[in-house]
A protein has these predicted regions:
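N-terminal secretory signal peptides and thylakoid transit peptides that target proteins
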Residues: 1-17
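Beta1/beta-strand and adjacent pyrophosphate-binding region of the FAD-binding site
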Residues: 56-68
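Core beta-strand elements of the Rossmann-like FAD/NAD(P) dinucleotide-binding domain
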Residues: 58-60, 248-257
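A glycine-rich dinucleotide-binding beta-alpha-beta segment and adjacent secondary-structure elements
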Residues: 228, 427-507, 599-603
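Active-site- and interface-proximal helix/loop "cap" or "latch" segments in soluble metabolic
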Residues: 566-659
C-alpha cells in the first residue's frame, strides 16, 4: 500500500480546506488523547487513508447521482458488473426522471453503420474541436442502439418504430430523421422509438424497470439531493458524496466510483444568463435541472466544456409564451408552418427591429446562418406582432391556445403599438413598412423568409404579445473522456469520478435529435462499467511533525520598480527614463566628451514592438555629444514611446558626464 508523507497530505488538505473536514470528523478519542498527561507515553503513530478520517453514514461500491436515463443506465450496468449501487435523486419519485421522462422518447440510430455515424457527428461539430475518441464512442453507441436496447435492456425489436418520413397531426417528425440531411453519413441516420409512440414516457419506464428489477443490487434514495463530492486532497480521488436526506447531511462512501448524471442547467437562470447569454426564457423539459452536478464537479477540479451549447424549440424562431416558474413552456409551430408563424406575423426585439426568420423550420432551436445552424442571439425582450386578418386565421385554425389568444393586445396604429410595447415608433414603423415591401415583392432582405410565408399587414389593427425564448436543454458540464471519466483542467482523469448524459454532453455545435438519449445510454453504460471496477486501495498517510524555516516578508520579492544599483567606471554614467511598462536603464560610456558606448541594462518592453528599439538605437548614439543631437536620432517605427524613453535615458547620463 502506498504511503504519503504528512507534508504532502497537509499541503493538499490545506488547498481544499480539508483541515476543517478532518476536525469535523475526528473521533472523541482525539480530544481524550489531547487532554492526557504530558508524562504519558507517546502515542503510537498510526497510518490511515483519507477515507478513514470521514464519518460515513452509508457505503456502496458505486454512487450514482441522478435518476434520468444516464443515471439508471449507469446504475444498471454497474450492478450487472457486480457492484452494490445507490442512486441519489434530488426529487421525490413522482417528479424524478429529468428530461428523460418528459422528452419525445426518440433515440438516434445509425442502422448499424458506425462509419456513417462518425462522418455525420464529425460534420455536426461544425469545425469545432472534439476528440476523435468521443466521436468514436458516440458513433459506436448510435450504430448499435437497436441491439443495445433489446439485448441489454429488454426492449422488443418487433415494436420499434422508425420515424423517417412520418408526419403526425401537422408535425413533421420526419424532419428530424435525419435532422441534417445535407451532412455526410445522413443516409444511415434516423430517429427511432422503442414502440409505436412518442412523448409518452415509454423508454423511461423501460429503463426504470431495469433498476427495479435489480433491487438486490440497487438502492434508490428519492428526495436526497447530492450536495458535494468528498475528495482525497492529495490524490484527488473522489471517495464519496455528501447527500441531504430527511433534513440531515449524510456521507456516502463510494468504494469504486461516483457517476454524475444530474443533467444540465436549463432551470438555473443565473447560469443560463452567464453561459448562454439568454435572459428571458422558459424551459421546456424537466424543471429540476439546475446545474448541481456541474458545480460539484468544478469544486473537485473538473474542467468544463460545451457550456455555450444548448437546444431550443422547433418553430417561430424558438420563442414561446411566458409561463410560471416550474411549468414547462409550450412549443409553437413545431417543425411546421401554420397560422402562427406565416402571413402577417413578425417578431421584433427591444428596439422594434426583426431579428429572425419567423417561418423557418427550426432545428432544435438552431437557425441557418452562413453554412451552419446556430442558436439565434435573442434580444432582451421579444414581441410577437400580427394583424387583424392573421388573428382571424389563427382562431379559425385553432393554432393558438385560448389562454394565449386572450393575451394579445389590440392597437389601432403603429404609433400606439410602439408606445404600448415600449419600442421606438420610427424604427417599428420602418420595420413593418420594410416587411410589407418584402412580402409584396417576394424577397425578405432582412431575415430571408420565403415568399409563400409572407403577407403584408392589412393596416386595420395590430396585435402584440410578449414572448420569451424557449430552452429545451443545455449540453455543457464537466469534460469527460471516451471512458466517461471526468477530466481536470490539465486533461487528467479525476480518480473514481465519471459522468454521463447532459451533464457535460458531447454536442459542441449542431445537434441531431435523439442524440442526448443515445449518449445517456452510451456513456451511462461506459460510466457504470468503469465505476464498478474494483480500484486499488487508497494510499495511507503518516502524520508527524516536521521542522520548517519559512521565508519572511521581504525575503523574496520580484516586484518591478524597486531601486537597483549598477556598477560604473569613472567614465560611465547611469541614465534612466520611463518606458512602456517599467523604467529603461542605460549605462553610457563617455570619452573626450563624446558617447563611446550605450548599454541597455534594464528594460521590460514588448517583444517585437519596443524591444527592437533597445537593440538598434544604442549604436546610433555613439559619437554624439549634445542633447539636441541625441533627440535628432530617428526612432524605430512602431516603437515611438520606447525610442523616446531611450533617448531621454541617454541624455540623462550625458548631462551627468558634463557636470
Amino acid at each position: 500500500m502506498e504511503k504519503i508523507s504528512r507534508k504532502s497530505f497537509v499541503k493538499g488538505a490545506l488547498g481544499l480546506g480539508a483541515v476543517g473536514i478532518l476536525a469535523g470528523c475526528a473521533s472523541s478519542a482525539s480530544s481524550t488523547a489531547a487532554s492526557a498527561s504530558s508524562t504519558a507515553a507517546p502515542a503510537e503513530k498510526k497510518e490511515f487513508t483519507f477515507a478513514d478520517t470521514v464519518r460515513w453514514d452509508a457505503q456502496y461500491d458505486v454512487v450514482v447521482m441522478g435518476m434520468g436515463a444516464a443515471g439508471m443506465v449507469a446504475a444498471k450496468t454497474a450492478a450487472d458488473n457486480g457492484a452494490k449501487v445507490v442512486i441519489v435523486e434530488k426529487c421525490e419519485e413522482g417528479k424524478a426522471g429529468g428530461n428523460t421522462k418528459v422528452c419525445g422518447q426518440l433515440v438516434a440510430y445509425a442502422n448499424g453503420d458506425k462509419d456513417a455515424a462518425k462522418s455525420y457527428y464529425t460534420a455536426l461539430a461544425g469545425g469545432r474541436d472534439i476528440e476523435p475518441e468521443i466521436i468514436d464512442a458516440i458513433s459506436e453507441g448510435v450504430a448499435n442502439m437497436a441491439d443495445i436496447l433489446a439485448d441489454e435492456f429488454g426492449f422488443n425489436k418487433d415494436e420499434y418504430m422508425d420515424w423517417t418520413g412520418v408526419n403526425v397531426g401537422g408535425t413533421n417528425m420526419g424532419a428530424m430523421s435525419p435532422e441534417y440531411p445535407e451532412m455526410p453519413g445522413h443516409e444511415k441516420m434516423a430517429l427511432w422509438t422503442t414502440h409505436a409512440g412518442a412523448s409518452d414516457g415509454y423508454l423511461y419506464q423501460g429503463l426504470k424497470q431495469n433498476v427495479t428489477d435489480r433491487v438486490d443490487a440497487i438502492d434508490v434514495w428519492y428526495s436526497s439531493p447530492a450536495k458535494s463530492l468528498i475528495q482525497d486532497p492529495v490524490t484527488k480521488t473522489v471517495v464519496g458524496v455528501t447527500v441531504e436526506r430527511d433534513g440531515k447531511e449524510m456521507n456516502i462512501r463510494a468504494l469504486n466510483g461516483v457517476c454524475i448524471c444530474t443533467g444540465g442547467f436549463e432551470c438555473n437562470k443565473e447560469m443560463v444568463q452567464h453561459y448562454l447569454n439568454v435572459i428571458n426564457y422558459a424551459p421546456r423539459g424537466g424543471q429540476f435541472n439546475t446545474g448541481d452536478g456541474i458545480k460539484m464537479a468544478q469544486a473537485v477540479g473538473a474542467d468544463l466544456w460545451h457550456m455555450d451549447c444548448y437546444e431550443g424549440l422547433f418553430g417561430l424562431g424558438s420563442v414561446t409564451y411566458p409561463v410560471e416558474e416550474g411549468i414547462p413552456c409550450d412549443m409553437i409551430a413545431t417543425l411546421a408552418q401554420n397560422a402562427v408563424n406565416t402571413g402577417a406575423a413578425i417578431l421584433v426585439g427591444t428596439d422594434g427591429d426583426r431579428f429572425v426568420n419567423e417561418s423557418e423550420t427550426v432545428r432544435h432551436g438552431h437557425l441557418y446562418e452562413n453554412g451552419i445552424w446556430e442558436n439565434p442571439t435573442f434580444p432582451e425582450k421579444v414581441w410577437y406582432i400580427i394583424d387583424e386578418t392573421q388573428k382571424g386565421e389563427i382562431e379559425a385554425a385553432g393554432a393558438m391556445p385560448e389562454e394565449q389568444l386572450a393575451k394579445l393586445t389590440a392597437y389601432d396604429s403603429i404609433d400606439a403599438l410602439a408606445e404600448g410595447i415600449g419600442v421606438d415608433k420610427d424604427r417599428l414603423t420602418k420595420t413593418i413598412k420594410n416587411y410589407n415591401s418584402f412580402a409584396n415583392n417576394g424577397e425578405d432582405y432582412k431575415c430571408g423568409r420565403e415568399a409563400q410565408y409572407m403577407r403584408a399587414f392589412d393596416g386595420k389593427k395590430y396585435y402584440a404579445m410578449y414572448m420569451v425564448s424557449g430552452l429545451l436543454n443545455t449540453q455543457g458540464g464537466p469534460k469527460r473522456s471516451a471512458n466517461a471519466e471526468v477530466l481536470d483542467t490539465q486533461g487528467n482523469p479525476i480518480p473514481h469520478l465519471y459522468s454521463a448524459g447532459e451533464c457535460g454532453g458531447i454536442t459542441v455545435c449542431m445537434y441531431q435529435g435523439g442524440t442526448n438519449i443515445a449518449e445517456c445510454i452510451t456513456f451511462g453504460r461506459i460510466a457504470g462499467k468503469n465505476a464498478a471496477a474494483v480500484k486499488d486501495a487508497l494510499p495511507t498517510y503518516t502524520v508527524e511533525a516536521v521542522e520548517s524555516a519559512p521565508a519572511q516578508p521581504g525575503d523574496i520579492d520580484d516586484l518591478v520598480g524597486k531601486e537597483e544599483t549598477y556598477e560604473t567606471a569613472d567614465n560611465q554614467y547611469i541614465g534612466k527614463a520611463q518606458g512602456m511598462d517599467d523604467e529603461i536603464v542605460v549605462r553610457v560610456t563617455v570619452d573626450d566628451g563624446k558617447i563611446s558606448q550605450v548599454e541597455v541594462l534594464k528594460q521590460n518592453e514588448t517583444e517585437g514592438i519596443g524591444v527592437p528599439a533597445t537593440e538598434q538605437l544604442p549604436e546610433k548614439f555613439v559619437g554624439l555629444d549634445t542633447e539636441e543631437a541625441i533627440n535628432a536620432v530617428d526612432g524605430i517605427s512602431g516603437a515611438t514611446i520606447t525610442s523616446n524613453a531611450l533617448k531621454q535615458a541617454v541624455v540623462n547620463a550625458l548631462l551627468q558626464a558634463k557636470g
